[in-house]
Amino acid sequence: MSHLRKNQKEINKADTTFNSSNETCDSGNLVKLTDIDDDFIVELRYATEDNFTGKRVYESAECYIDRETLKMLIEARDVFKKDGYRVKIWDAYRPISAQKRFWEIYPDDNFVARPPDMETMTSFRSTHMNGQCVDITLTDMEGNELKMPTCFDDFREIAAIKNNDPETEEYRNAAYMCKVMEAAGFGASPTEWWHFYDNKNPHPRYLDYRI
């Protein structure tokens, strides 16, 4: 039985009422990943200073994700695991307040989505803010990261899979990850090899549930 089928009931019944500091904030369709599945490696970069801002943006290192998107991620994870790999998550749900901080630090539409109150007709929308997007990489079963085109949050053109030499290990690993994620229903960013968004389910509203 796949992890997706095994965890289906847990995902559907997961409690979305979180801590008292957020009791007035709408948590939407979010679930806490560790309440559902402990087979992912969670390393939220924005809960540390090891990110492009150089500052800790999230108060908590808990990973939240839209419940329907999680079903897709588990489906992809099962394929990766069968092939001998694990999924490491660098980011998932992101509060609106955090997106505002990112825009203040790096206001470039090519790499950072505008916060909702600054969106234009042509700007792209980040589904991190409703929990339907994940930034990931792959590791071996011991947790060692596979070689990829760049580090996380690298804003150079080489972060796009297409800008890499198809003969390299980095390209092959990123292309493989992309293929599996797309088969599970995700869309892939054309500029960031690590960035995948839910391309299957309706997109709910943005949330500002603080983490």
Segments (PLM) and residue ranges:
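Short, well-ordered surface patches within globular domains
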Residues: 98
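Segments that shape or occlude catalytic/ligand-binding pockets
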Residues: 95
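Extracytoplasmic cell-surface/polysaccharide-interacting catalytic and binding patches
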Residues: 1-92, 102-191, 197-211
